[in-house]
Amino acid sequence: MTKKKVKPNSNTIALNKRARHDYFIEDEIEAGLELQGWEVKSMRAGKANISDSYVIFKNGEAFLFGASIQPLNVASTHIVCDPTRTRKLLLNKRELASLFGKANRDGFTIVALSLYWKSAWAKVKIGLAKGKKQQDKRDDIKEREWKVTKDRIMKNAHRRS
């Protein structure tokens, strides 16, 4: 009797942790991705990177630019694999119009936040973002450090009681 393969609990393929550090995220939207077969196989193997990716608009359509999906070594040899190709985002017209209008405001951009599986479909969570200044980043770090210190103090206070 063979053992069943244990499936990982997490459906997340790739995260863009840098985006939350560098930007204020105003709004989040889920979008589908138009992928080729070798890209799906590579994503299942966890070979995706969205750290420097963002959304661009061309001819009324949205595209994910800068995402890197490395091809597997065992991928087909007769297909040319471009790891950094621009991938089309699958959104309905209302979402596209809304995103386009919001992104055209001063200081706003659209960045990829995470790449994950939703049942059998690959989805990307994109966020409407506004850039942070250096002082804002410092404030976030101070706030995070204070939270850790406060938790440590509370933990020690409960032990002494």
From Swiss-Prot:
Give the GO biological process terms. trans-translation
Q: Please indicate which superkingdom the organism of origin belongs to.
A: Bacteria
For this protein, the record's InterPro entries field holds: SmpB (IPR023620), SsrA-bd_prot (IPR000037), SsrA-bd_prot_CS (IPR020081)
Q: Which Gene3D superfamilies match?
A: 2.40.280.10
PROSITE patterns reported in the protein's UniProt record: SSRP (PS01317)
User: Which GO molecular function annotations are given, in alphabetical order?
Assistant: RNA binding
Q: What is its main location?
A: cytoplasm
**Keywords assigned:** Cytoplasm, RNA-binding
Q: Does the keyword Cytoplasm apply?
A: yes
In the UniProt record for this chain, what is stated about the effect of gene disruption? Answer: Essential, it cannot be disrupted.
Entry GO CC: cytosol
Q: Where in the cell is it found?
A: Cytoplasm
Q: Does the keyword RNA-binding apply?
A: yes
* Purpose of the protein: Required for rescue of stalled ribosomes mediated by trans-translation. Binds to transfer-messenger RNA (tmRNA), required for stable association of tmRNA with ribosomes. tmRNA and SmpB together mimic tRNA shape, replacing the anticodon stem-loop with SmpB. tmRNA is encoded by the ssrA gene; the 2 termini fold to resemble tRNA(Ala) and it encodes a 'tag peptide', a short internal open reading frame. During trans-translation Ala-aminoacylated tmRNA acts like a tRNA, entering the A-site of stalled ribosomes, displacing the stalled mRNA.
The family line of this record is: Belongs to the SmpB family.
Show the NCBIfam families listed in the entry. Answer: PRK05422.1 (NF003843), smpB (TIGR00086)
**Protein name (Swiss-Prot/TrEMBL):** SsrA-binding protein
